[in-house]
Amino acid sequence: MFTDKINLALKIAAKVHQGQNRKGTDIPYISHPVAVGMIISQYTNDETTIVAGILHDILEDVNPGIYSEADMRRDFGDEITDIVKDVSEPKTAGQPKLLWKERKKSYLKRLGSSYYIETYFVVAADKIHNLTDILKDYDQFSNEIWHRFNASKWDILQYHRAVFNLIRKEPVPIELKRHLAALIEKLGDIVAINP
């Protein structure tokens, strides 16, 4: 599916993520939001959900002086912006960044209270892509990949399990849930082998 709104989301995401790379790599960051949108499109052709997937990291990772929540509301409306907010870690201007566990706890709380079913599609696709990359990189670099993160591999596994426990209760396609569950299980196998 390709629409004017999806095209606009791709253009804005490419512009605002310019110069950013995937964690611990030289891969341009735009590959992630595009992949999330593509994963979502395997399970639904809902334009709102696909656009939210493409935009999902902007409010969390982009300086509001470059592209703000108000810009997103203007360009994409309240529903898409609210979905993106629901999948974003909270930012507090002028405050130091919270520790990894505190950020994830806050994220899970926000996610658990989301009004939009689309939120869970976006989160599942985001985690599917992140875990796919982690597992592929693990195959190539082994335990070296864990140095990229501000958390232990055990904490990363537990976090993904907690996210899945929220998603599995929601009316999203069983195939999407199974895809995510299989990746979490593979991560669990790695953590069990190399504690």
Annotate each PLM feature.
Residues 1-195:
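Active-site helical microenvironments for divalent-metal-assisted chemistry
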